Each structure stands twice: as C-alpha cells, then as structure tokens.
Amino acid sequence: MKYETQLFGGQANLHCMKQILHNAKSNSHGCIRLAICIATAFAVFMLTACSDGNGTKSFRSSDEAIREYHGFLTNLRQSDKVTIQSLAKTINEWRVLDDSVSSCISRDTVRKAHSYPFGTYRELNDSIHIELCRMAMSKQRTFHDLLYLREQTSSHVGDEELQQAVKEAQPFFASLDSLPIYNKGGKQAVLKRYLLFLQKSAKQGIHGKEDLLAFIKEEHLYFKSFLQYLPDFADDDIGDIRRNTEHCCREILRAADRKDLSHKDAMIYLSMRTNHRLLRNAQAAIEDLNSGRVKDEHTMHAYLLMMMQPFMTMDDLSVSVLSDKDKADLYKIADALPKEMDGLAKKLHLDKQRLSDMPMLMMKIYVTRL
C-alpha cells in the first residue's frame, strides 16, 4: 500500500466558516452556491492511495472491451430511481469493469489519444459518469445515503493492511475523549494556552511516532476545552490557531519526508485525528443549537456548515479509517441533520427544499469525481 501526501489546510473550523460566510448572502441560492464551493474547494486532507489495477474480467481485444463497456452504458440508461444500495453496487461493478477495459486498451499497439480505442473509451467513460450522476439524482437522497455510498464505494474497501493499521491506532484515539477539560481562566485563557501549545509544537517539530502521538493527545486536550466556548468565539479572530495548526501538520508531513515517521503512520493518524475533530465539531454544533447557546444569525450560518462539514470534506481514506464508534456517531449526525437544518431554515429564512437537496448535490460531486 503506497501513500502520497499533498498540500492540505489546517482546521480551526469556526474561523474558516466565518471567513467563508463573510461575503455570503443568507438567501437560499447563495447558500447552495456556497455549499457547492466548499464541497469542491475546502478540504482538510487530500490523501490518495494507488490502485493495483486488477480486475475480474479479461478481454481478448480492445474491440471486445469497448463492446462490453458500451453494453454497460446501455444498461445504465435503462435504470431509473435506483436505491442507494443499487447505486453503490453499480458503481463498484463499473470500477471493476473500468479497470479491466482500461488495462486491455492500454496494451493496444496504436496509441493515438483521440482515435479508436482510446477516444471511444474516454467518450464512454464520460457518458457513464453522466448516467451515474443521473442515477444519484433520480431520488431524494439523505446524508445517511451519502455516507453509505461513500463507505461502500471507497477505493480502500478490502484493504487489509490499512484496516490492521487502523485497528492498532483505535485504542489511542478512543482514549482521547476521556481527557479532562481544562478551562481555568475562561475563554481567553483557554485560547491563549491553545495558541502557545501550537506555537511551541510548530517550533519543536515532530521527530518520530512518539512525538506525533504526544502532539495529537495534547492538542486534543486544548481543542476539547476550546469547544466548550465555541459559540463565544463567533466574533473573535482565531486565525492564529488555524495558521499554527497548519504549521504543525506540515511538520508531521516533513517528518515523514525525512523518514523520522512512516508516510503510512502520518496519513492514517492525521486522517483519524481530523475525523475525530470533525465529528466533535458537528456534535458540539448540534448540542449548542439544541441548548439555545447560539443566538445570532451569523453564528447559525457557521453552525449549519459545521454540521455538514464531515460530509463535505472527508475523502476515501478518511471514511475508510473511521472506527466503528465514529462511524455510528457520524450516522447519528446524518440522521439528526434534517431536523436541525429544518429549524435553522426557519430562523434564517432559507428555502427548506434547497437545503434538503444538499445531500444530492454532494453525492453528484462525489460521483463526478470517481
């Protein structure tokens, strides 16, 4: 299993949401456009793993492969209003077929990008993507459906090496929620301690797995205290937290580049760390909204996006490293979102139907990128 690192942003999520929302209008069209932009551009991690390229079909010629691919497209065009289970199954079948077809035509002796069979393959591939998107949009979808599709069609499904590494890391992350909350001195003291810790960690760097675990553990201690004051930070500039968090994460990747830390550990632990934070952010947002702690519309907009953020930003690796508990928690958030969004729609005068269509838009973006 090979891991590659790409540039990613840190996460002081409320600040990011505030910056995004600064120029956003509170009408429904603005909300939808904003969410699409976030789903396509705002990413905490961009993590990729290489496919082995193996399929289950074998073709004797490019002609045979293209005919099979065309037949698959024809069958898709006859499908309508499919269940999410059927859509997931179809996507997985297409991936196997696509690997086989692309592998077969890559052996073709005539390699002309815009001619047969390569040009035909690309045209069919584009048409299949269009049909899969149509199928995704053929019925009303929920956040539960979106998570199910992401889970079932992840490119890491069946990766035993990854699952073993995740299993070994789970006890460490499970222990984080038992850490005490240290909020002595109020919100400004909490913010100051958090920032000092990040600055110190960025300066010292990460020099091995032991340093990585120590950083994640202590960071979560300050982050957990920070969440207690989340609504109170709505009007505060916490850009220093975001920038120093990014710096610390870059130090982890530099440690992997120096081979002080394996790329596998860097990617898995960073993904699991981010999952943990996204979940706790969304849970805190729901709790704060239900307790009446969120009063102003500006913060409500931010909280709306915070609740949806896990479904916008998690990539294949992030979904694949979710523990059973975190996965169950994420499904609970998915099931709670319709009610929470309905309540916010009334308070913020948003179009409820357009908000309810958000999972479909996110699903379309996901399928388009397959």
Feature map (PLM): residue ranges:
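Intrinsically disordered, low-complexity segments enriched in Gly and acidic/Ser/Thr residues
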Residues: 274-334
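C-terminal motif of bacterial Sec signal peptides marking the signal peptidase cleavage site
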Residues: 46-49
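Long, low-complexity or tandemly repetitive, helically biased scaffold regions used
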Residues: 106-134, 141-154, 186, 225-236, ...
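Immediate post-signal-peptide N-terminus of mature secreted/exported proteins
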Residues: 53-92, 151, 158-194, 203, ...
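Coil residues (strongly favoring Ser/Thr
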Residues: 86, 99-100, 108-109, 127, ...
